[in-house]
């Protein structure tokens, strides 16, 4: 992870499974506040990337529109990247790359001041984005 106390955090969701299939929490304000979630949810988006190898990003908003986001993989897998773009950061342009997958139940918290993007690993990768600021 980048050399910042307030950097990206890999989140491992804990699904509950039984004979009916599975249930997993996507967002919990109390749990995410512990890792820096700044406040209310302003927008939730869904993306589907049809072809393996497709790159999407790098996206970020500068103040006063800076946003935090929780990126959750709900189908397939992606190589997800967050880049520190804070003007005053000694770690500026450092990055973290992690694999997010629906099977592993992984997500990433991307705080304000980080650009975000990903590359789809298999065909038909799907992500849910939870944003702190509306786009």
Positions of PLM-derived features:
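Non-catalytic, conserved peripheral segments adjacent to functional cores
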Residues: 1-103, 122-124, 131-135
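Short beta-strand His + acidic residue motifs that chelate non-heme Fe in jelly-roll/DSBH
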Residues: 81, 108, 116-121
